[in-house]
């Protein structure tokens, strides 16, 4: 949906290696999923975009005044350094029905980015049986060895990565 609204859509993966899938794996999944969308560029992640360097409380999931300050710093860096370098005037983001930290980040995005000339477009997540799909649900299904629950929640090009993860877990 986002790619239809702009000439070039830049996708910037979070560079931190703090999940079940490494940055390299996540970037490869994004590249595979976007391969046939001609105007999408999957960029290298940055140490200055939703990173432990600028936004450590995101990874601690502590929603407090420090977190809000760090979110503001992260969003200002995004606007003044990253978006300006790319010439990006719109930031697309998925809505967040589950995580209070990310909900607050989205709220601040709507406050801060327009001041820098960047529109924010918040899009509804894909859903399954009237429930928004989350990465947490996929991770939980994988941890429980329930591939049949995880697979419908991801893009088809991601399935080989899920199978590889399950195979590694089985060893």
Please name every model-derived segment.
Residues 1-171:
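Nucleotidyltransferase catalytic core that binds NTPs
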